Regions:
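Domain-level signal for soluble alpha/beta catalytic cores
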Residues: 1-178
Length: 178
């Protein structure tokens, strides 16, 4: 595998994203059915060689918790988790960075943070909130390089390498480690 050929220590993260369903009472997904789905994914990722499990782009803390419960049923791999924050600040389910940090810390995750988002400033704002409650837990930032748009046959992101480099430096300076 590519990780074995890297010539340096490499961790392979098995990614699991949101189900696309809403938890009861707003939707039909139960915590148990959600956990079952994530257990199956975690088992496959672990047997495929993932060193850690990465639950990402979540908007609901209840779904995130069910995903963690499910993943822990079938794997002892460390778990990192990130949430997606929206234009007004919280996730689409109303979760703030502070709320996310508290719940993710309570779940005993190996690393916590934010990913995706509509723009870098929103992601940075959420990450600063997460940092304030993270304690010694490593914090992750994985922002989009802007909102993608089609130009002809190409999908283009507005964030240049310079914009992304400045973003990364701000986050490192703030205390982000992943």
């Amino acid at each position: 595998a590519a990780a074995d050929e890297a010539g340096r220590p490499v961790l392979v993260a098995g990614s699991m994203g949101p189900s696309g369903e809403l938890m009861e009472p707003m939707g039909t997904m139960t915590p148990d059915s959600c956990a079952d789905a994530f257990a199956s994914q975690a088992e496959g990722l672990a047997s495929g060689g993932a060193d850690l499990l990465w639950i990402e782009t979540m908007s609901s803390l209840d779904e995130l918790e069910a995903a963690v419960v499910g993943a822990r049923r079938t794997s002892e791999r460390p778990i990192a988790a990130t949430m997606r924050f929206e234009t007004a600040g919280p996730t689409m389910m109303g979760v703030t960075g502070e709320d996310a940090a508290r719940r993710m810390i309570d779940l005993g995750l190996a690393a916590i943070g934010a990913n995706c988002g509509n723009n870098i400033a929103e992601t940075e704002s959420a990450v600063v909130q997460i940092l304030s409650g993270a304690g010694d837990t490593p914090v992750i930032v994985k922002a989009n390089a802007g909102v993608p748009e089609f130009r002809g046959d190409s999908l283009i992101y507005s964030g240049s390498p310079e914009v992304m480099g400045a973003h990364v430096q701000r986050m490192v300076d703030a205390g982000v480690s992943i």
